[in-house]
Amino acid sequence: MSRTLRPSAMGSRVGALASPGLALLLSLTAHCSGPQAKGLPKGGLNASEANTWVRNNTSLLQNFWCLPASQLPREQLSSLIRSLASQRVALKAWQLSCLANLAAQLGLQDDFEFHPPNLLLFYDLSQVGDTNCRAFIHHAAQGDTELLTNLPNQRVALQRTALACLGGPHLQLSASDLWLLGVLVCDMEAAQIVTADPSVLRNLLRCPRLTVMQTAALNTLLASGKTQIGPPGSWNLQGLQALGLLATYISPHLWEKVQEAVGLDFFRSVVAACRAGQLSRHDARRFVDNFLESKATSVSSRPKRRTGRSCVRGNITAATLHDDLFLVHYDCTQLESCLGTRVLRANLDPLLQHPLPAECQRVVKAKLTQIYPHGIPEDQLHLIPSLVYLYSLAEIGQWNITSGDTVMILLASDAALDNQTEAVLQRFLDHNGKVTGALLVAIGGSRLCWMSLKQLQFIQPSEFRLAGAPDISPCPQSRKDALFVKAHEVFRNTSNVGEYYYLIRPYLGGAPLEELQYLAQANISMDIDTFTNLNPLTLKSMGVDSVRNLLGQNLGDLRKARNHPNVILWMHSHNMTDLSDMGLYTSPTQAYVANRPPNTAYPPSSLIHSLDPPGNDGVSHTSGSPPVHLGYLSLAVALPSSLLWLLLCQLPSGQMATAHRTLGPMALAQGSWTPEHQIPEKRSC
């Protein structure tokens, strides 16, 4: 069902633009984003002002998706991709995978030097020639390989291609090799790191995390004294600071060899950075734990926990808590003995700005319970996000939470545990709080996983629409199912099936079989990232032809994900003849086990869910993706208005059937096409 859209007030405000294409671009982004648009003058804009407005509202242009973009001619798609690169726009995996396929279909892959590095990660590596191999790998190695979390085969192939460019596996990676490999070193084994040129530290700095074995390799390399900062006994503050986050992985054994004054100076700098928000508490606490462990045996004046609880170091005062070496002078036993409740009540904030070890956090929590036996006041809740994980559901039930700001602070990513989400939200709802779209965006999509079914029902459809595209891949399957039901209820009346898919896509991990069959008939060409996050049991029930139709032009990406646990499960449910027709012709399990990169967290527990009885609420740990932004201002003038409309919101007439969505998935409505001169009244790009 489609309805003619009346011109919006926002649309009329951009009518004075010099370029019709740019005028339409601003009109669409403002209309699609609603209240997010800001600073658009009522009297119209000239071309210069329009460019400024777009620069200030880049986040409005993040709604790129491949289905309408697939209609762009080669030259205009090329311009779009180059614009993404020049503006350093960070797309998500689901956008990049299909965009890479569009580029390949139009022969744009050879222009890789002008493309975003993240896009190169998704290209067909078999098309990379010997002559441009090194240039391709070096450019791709500036990207974020975490985007390939759901494409294990592509991640392994990327590393193999890189080593092939070097002439095969090396016993020792040289400085020039490491320059070429960039972030790809993060997927290499510890043995290769130990034997590499010491400049490998620059590569490791780009790793989002180090494995246990890589951490050991780092410490071996640092202990050798071959790096630029020399042996541990000669380290200085500048050298340690040059290590960046790598310094937080230094072992207690190495800290024992560092000059005491240098170690203490670095300790001060880490605590100061943590206080200033320049270093995460997680990273700071890793360093503090290692450093204090190295000092535990050398500080003989510290009393042992079981030898008495007298205060040896002196009573803790406000001035003491502002000392960046506070944790060096007071271990957790002395914190318990020397910190009075009066000082704690007046100085809770400066105390919790320190990256306290877990044992010290428990001491502080116990003292707060003495001060506030009937629950912590709301103004104090704002100060304790680092302690929230220690509180039981019963204790949270004593809190008075009346502000959405309090909820945001308590449910920040590094605060409450997942299973505390429901209790915190319930205290807010008990005080007539409202779960808004802004609140959902602020606390993150994964928090949706842990809301009760009743709480989900409290979310108004208008607010649910404003929640954006949350990443619910970490959710237990039962919650994914519930979230799909909620999302389907909200979006089911979307008249255009393409737009419906765009809105429902983040929730398809809980979609039933009939929904996926409906989408397969609709020719939406599901991206591989969304496909690998489908319910494994539902996916297992899909036939080869259904999967072929569901993936459409992205079918070739199955080979890049063939060792993903969910794809393995689906492949095992079909015969090899059918799979061979799709290019999936060898046993997946053996390759999966042998080729897993060290930083790939497999198998995710979504595979375990598939083997559990229905209703199992185990937690999946599939990682999410970086934030998305889209910018292609340079195309605003170049593209015809009709193509801008196509790119942002609408498909051309005849490309996609429209269907009035009812409570259950349904087949495409026969003959229900959207006329070119009509636009569905509810438009959200």
UniProtKB/Swiss-Prot annotation:
Region of interest (Disordered), residue spans: 603-624
Cytoplasmic side: 649-685
Protein name: Mesothelin-like protein
Species in which this protein is naturally found: Mus musculus (Mouse)
Cell location: Membrane
Gene label: Mslnl
Residues that carry a glycan: N315, N400
GO terms classed as biological process: cell adhesion
Keyword set, alphabetical order: Cell adhesion, Glycoprotein, Membrane, Signal, Transmembrane, Transmembrane helix
Bilayer topology term: Single-pass type I membrane protein
